[in-house]
Amino acid sequence: GHLVIVSEFADLEGKDAKAALHAYLIVIQAGAILAVGLIYRKEIWSMLLGFLGMDPRGKRLGFNLIIAFLPAAAMGPFLDDLIESYLFGLLPIAAALFTGALFMHWAESRKKRIEGEYPAKAGKSLDDLTWTGSIFIGFLQCFAMWPGTSRSMMTIVGGYLVGLDRAKAAEFSFLLGLITLTAAAGYKCVTKWSLMSQHLAM
């Protein structure tokens, strides 16, 4: 969203400008993917062991992340062209930024109120996260397809709403982002490669 705003004010239009923007997004997403992979390498290793039947907690976390990823994986390819056609403008992005700020403020206020009134519900761990909670977070992540809506904000708020504490909501959000950003970057490379290759070479 922020990059689209900059491109609008910089008067970057046309196929070449869009290709350069896609190329730049791939580069910065690669940095985010590497950073999250490094920070959460222990959790990633735990999930790998879990899928080999050697770590039940890692297996549970891995399956929950896959479940949370499914809504975006199912909807993203079908909505990609529509989003680029209708939502990559200043007004839609401004609306998303404003609405996202209000949603985040509401969620934080709600969490503080619940923690104050019901200390026992102060926050669950990832071991307590159910598959229904995971898919709920995944559906909230889909709102981040709207440019200007923060993916991490939507998924952290989703974690709040299913009862996770702040640290675990953020952890789940970043691990989900590792999968989602990797898939999104791969999808863009496949579908936009002919336009982006010259800009990536530069």
How would you name each of these model-derived features?
Residues 1-202:
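Multi-pass membrane proteins that catalyze or facilitate reactions on polyprenyl-/lipid-phosphate substrates
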